[in-house]
Curated annotation (Swiss-Prot):
This is Tubulin epsilon chain. Keywords: Cytoplasm, Cytoskeleton, GTP-binding, Microtubule, Nucleotide-binding. Its main location: cytoplasm. GO terms for biological process: centrosome cycle; microtubule cytoskeleton organization; mitotic cell cycle. The lineage of its organism: Eukaryota, Metazoa, Chordata, Craniata, Vertebrata. Found in a complex with TEDC1, TEDC2, TUBE1 and TUBD1. The keyword Transcription regulation does not apply. It holds the Pfam family Tubulin_C. The keyword Cytoplasm applies. It comes from Homo sapiens (Human). GTP binds at residues 148-154.
Length: 475
């Protein structure tokens, strides 16, 4: 079995990462009750004999001694990482695989990318190499970061190029949290656009998630729970927003619940790599099947169910509803409407007590309501993992390469241009060594080119197959 390394960058990246490890440990504990270190758990955890001085002797089989997450934690402030190291998961992280500073990036992409990137490049590379040495077959780096701040956007995208240069054959999956229009970081449009250029050039797959969608989801769940519409039938710990408290404090802040939704997404995304299944999907198959053109590697994700009812018998109707929900606006982790946009490809990653026949039936049922590009009408990729998430009998993660992502990028560009036309706050960036105004113009040109690619695809929508323009090949 292959291994993956999680790289969590900045405050947001580390908080989501911590939630992910908490949930992953609970999942493996529920399945692996004998405490045996097996291939499933080795995909994201090392088994270390803490009695061995130095790096700790890795144990490839037998009883679990001390689990260490295959993770690198990076932040240019100490607060969140220190909180993790004082929390219930403190022993899960290798303290040699942490990089922190005390000054922070000041919500400035240039500081994170240019200053801290140069300053910490060698240390970061050393941590990556060390993580790779502990893997028998390293398949993927998962990067978790936010786009609005300085460290996540700047340093988070700097290390993508480092990974591409050092490990060109290893996939780079990026989970990027996009700021909402009401973001309290006034320079977040600059940071996001500058980061987008790096994502366009150096990521294999990007899962864009916006804060507003996460907030809308938890608001809907809270409304249903508090209004009594769900009665007392919600299964304990089945809410996609719930956590056992990997981080201290902040119990009732919406960001905790929002982070848990993203952690659940990552949990389901990696389930085929961590558990057996009748139709497992390798992580490299996601990029292979869902990304037909290099730059169009942005995948819109949706998660269902958001909670599970306590009755054990699942009527087929409810199972079918799970598939329908995955294509509805309410379950998207990005403000998007995939059903009314154009699909390039779609992956359905199902977990739990679901049959292949259920999967096929629902694809056939939903197909007429979805529009795929003419050259990929059967652009479905499916997986079935037999192990459901804790608290659920079944779940579904849908990943769509769909033109519905375009409005998010257009809105981001508009917010960027509102600032840039006034040259507002530009001096904070230009005073950083290595930062020039051309960095901004190149970044917005890169985004404009990406939007144009989606425009060209949208132009083929509803066009008869025989009228579609043919690919011209230069001779």
């Amino acid at each position: 079995m292959t291994q993956s390394v999680v790289v969590q960058v900045g405050q947001c990246g580390n908080q989501i990462g911590c939630c992910f490890w908490d949930l992953a440990l609970r999942e493996h504990a529920a399945v692996n009750q004998k405490g045996i270190y097996d291939e499933a758990i080795s995909s994201f955890f090392r088994n270390v004999d803490t009695r061995v001085v130095g790096d700790g002797g890795s144990i490839s089989k037998g009883k679990i001694c001390s689990l260490k997450a295959r993770a690198v934690l990076i932040d240019m402030e100490e607060g969140v990482v220190n909180e993790i190291l004082q929390g219930p998961l403190r022993d899960v992280f290798d303290t040699k695989q942490l990089i922190t500073d005390i000054s922070g990036s000041g919500n400035n992409w240039a500081v994170g990318h240019k200053v801290f990137g140069s300053l910490y490049q060698d240390q970061i590379l050393e941590k990556f190499r060390k993580s790779a040495e502990h893997c028998d077959c390293l398949q993927c780096f998962f990067i978790i970061h936010s786009m609005g701040g300085g460290t996540g956007s700047g340093l988070g995208t700097f290390l993508l190029k480092v990974l591409e240069d050092e490990f060109p054959e290893v996939y780079r999956f990026v989970t990027s949290i996009y700021p909402s229009g009401e973001d309290d970081v006034i320079t977040s449009p600059y940071n996001s656009i500058l980061a987008m250029k790096e994502l366009n050039e150096h990521a294999d797959c990007v899962l864009p998630i916006d804060n507003q969608s996460l907030f809308d989801i938890i608001s809907k769940i809270d409304l249903m729970v508090n209004s009594g519409k769900l009665g007392t039938t919600v299964k304990p710990k089945s809410l996609v927003t719930s956590s056992s408290g990997a981080l201290k404090k902040q119990h009732k802040k919406p960001f905790d619940a929002m982070n848990n939704i993203v952690a659940n997404l990552l949990l389901n995304l990696t389930s085929s790599a961590r558990f057996e299944g009748s139709l497992n999907m390798d992580l490299n198959e996601i990029s292979m099947n869902l990304v037909p053109f290099p730059q169009l590697h942005y995948l819109v994700s949706s998660l269902t169910p958001l909670y599970t009812l306590t009755d054990v018998n699942i009527p087929p109707r409810r199972l079918d509803q799970m598939f329908s929900d995955a294509f509805s606006k309410d379950h998207q982790l990005l403000r998007a409407d995939p059903k009314h946009s154009l699909y390039l490809a779609c992956a359905l990653m199902v977990r739990g007590n679901v049959q292949i026949s259920d999967l096929r039936r629902n694809i056939e049922r939903l197909k007429p309501s979805l529009q795929f590009v003419s050259w990929n009408q059967e652009g479905w990729k499916t997986s079935l993992c037999s192990v459901p998430p804790v608290g659920h009998s079944h779940s579904l993660l849908a990943l769509a390469n769909n033109t519905c992502v375009k409005p998010t990028f257009m809105e981001l560009k508009e917010r960027f241009m509102r600032l840039y036309k006034k040259k507002a706050h530009l001096h904070h960036y230009l005073q950083v060594e290595g930062m020039e105004e051309s960095c901004f113009t190149e970044a917005v040109s890169s985004l404009s080119a990406l939007i144009q690619e989606y425009d060209q695809l949208d132009a083929t929508k509803n066009m008869p197959v025989q009228d579609l323009p043919r690919l011209s090949i230069a001779m």
